[in-house]
Amino acid sequence: MMQGEAHPSASLIDRTIKMRKETEARKVVLAWGLLNVSMAGMIYTEMTGKLISSYYNVTYWPLWYIELALASLFSLNALFDFWRYFKYTVAPTSLVVSPGQQTLLGLKTAVVQTTPPHDLAATQIPPAPPSPSIQGQSVLSYSPSRSPSTSPKFTTSCMTGYSPQLQGLSSGGSGSYSPGVTYSPVSGYNKLASFSPSPPSPYPTTVGPVESSGLRSRYRSSPTVYNSPTDKEDYMTDLRTLDTFLRSEEEKQHRVKLGSPDSTSPSSSPTFWNYSRSMGDYAQTLKKFQYQLACRSQAPCANKDEADLSSKQAAEEVWARVAMNRQLLDHMDSWTAKFRNWINETILVPLVQEIESVSTQMRRMGCPELQIGEASITSLKQAALVKAPLIPTLNTIVQYLDLTPNQEYLFERIKELSQGGCMSSFRWNRGGDFKGRKWDTDLPTDSAIIMHVFCTYLDSRLPPHPKYPDGKTFTSQHFVQTPNKPDVTNENVFCIYQSAINPPHYELIYQRHVYNLPKGRNNMFHTLLMFLYIIKTKESGMLGRVNLGLSGVNILWIFGE
């Protein structure tokens, strides 16, 4: 109970919160009080010494009134702060709680008063005559399986330390929790009553160790009726008898709930996790809620994050050598997505459509053996020479397919990559499954396929060069694949160098410098982006005599403005 001003309806938690706020405010008001005293002292010193008026040569009497008002204000604030500090220190809020409540509320010993547990009296009071107003009220009987003759009665000796609002009784001495009937001495002390204490009660809301569990709350608040005789042998006179009775009744009630179909959750029973019972009691429920071990991640997240961070830092270093701007890496994801979409919409989708169109024309011409994806690359090259007047696009298609002898896999993989809008099935260090078997190194990786079609597309856009009669102008000048090596000492060499096949890795050679971007799934795309970025910023958007901007190939739009 609070000392000083205390509202009778204030709860224990509210008073605890108020006490903690006062403890915190005590430090703050002391600091404010010292600050206000300091300010008032400074102003008083200025008033006596007239420092400001003499230094600035101003009229003193208006300034004196202003200083007087400020000094008075700070002095009053200081007095108020010191009064609050004195109040919180000398007459703090205190509580009377039990040791259990002190532990739960996290209170210090210096600010609370603990009350020892009260002994239960063994006083027995004879039963009172039944109340005729609630005869026959037994529809809310606690347990249908219990015999009326085996239900003991609660006496007021079991409620020591309470100021309860006792509730009504049923006929034959049966105690009821009827909220409409209030307790009176005439109704008898031997009836089971509501254990809800009145707010101003100075005692803890516990009845010894029995009431320490929250599971006993239903005996205080549930609308339950006990039909039993009023023999003196049925009265409870000590805690042991009460505890035994509560345990047995809880056991019965819990078994009923576990066996009922409505018990679908372990949390539906308020007594589920209380007491040490056998696992068999909960077998029915635990079958519905089985715990399963989670699968351990193959790669620790911390290692992955560290690898991503180091990869990003390495990429920043490489890009800084090209553009002197580390902020470019913030746009890299956007550029990569646009570039992948450009490859898909500009090269892959039209290529698949043209291949299907040529295959249809081959069937109409009576050459089903020359179906693209079924015929060998040698047969397709010969057909391109023979049937060039009839199918002029066949020679161009053959250039895209001249990558691997396995034409069936190559065509099917190009079709898969063209689906999804942004090459969603792309795998940088492998490819797709083929005829029910996993990808192996005898098949080209997706990176090799994309690099090949990209170079072939630019071969078709660059003008013919007499030095490269096969028509591979871009591939011959700007793409080198191991085991061949570019001439790094030549300042005019500007090419993409594939330094590893499996897993694929690409580097950029420009003006005797090697730009080696981090390995991984985006290495090829980032190398190509750097190649195009150099063309845009250092070559005025020109690749030889071809403009890669809006008036030409129109690929530099991916970098924005």
UniProtKB/Swiss-Prot annotation:
Topological type in the membrane: Multi-pass membrane protein
Q: What is known about its subunit structure?
A: Interacts with NUP205.
Name under which the protein is recorded: Transmembrane protein 209
The record's keywords, sorted A to Z, are: Cytoplasm, Glycoprotein, Golgi apparatus, Membrane, Nucleus, Phosphoprotein, Transmembrane, Transmembrane helix
This protein's GO CC annotations: Golgi apparatus; membrane; nuclear envelope
UniProt key word Transmembrane helix? yes
Q: Where does this protein reside within or beyond the cell?
A: Membrane; Nucleus envelope; Golgi apparatus; Cytoplasm
Tissue specificity of this protein: Expressed in the testis.
Quote the biased-composition stretches of kind Polar residues, using this chain's numbering: 220-229
Chief subcellular location equals: membrane
In the record, which positions carry Phosphoserine? 9, 11, 98, 201, 222, 248, 278
Q: Which InterPro entries match?
A: Cytochrome_B561-rel
Region (Disordered), start-end ranges: 119-157, 195-234, 250-271
Q: What is the role of the protein in this entry?
A: Nuclear envelope protein which in association with NUP205, may be involved in nuclear transport of various nuclear proteins in addition to MYC.
Q: What species does this protein belong to?
A: Homo sapiens (Human)
Glycosylation site list? 57, 274
Comp. bias regions, Low complexity: 133-157, 260-271
Q: Where are the transmembrane segments?
A: 28-48, 60-80
Pfam families (UniProt xref): CytochromB561_N (PF09786)
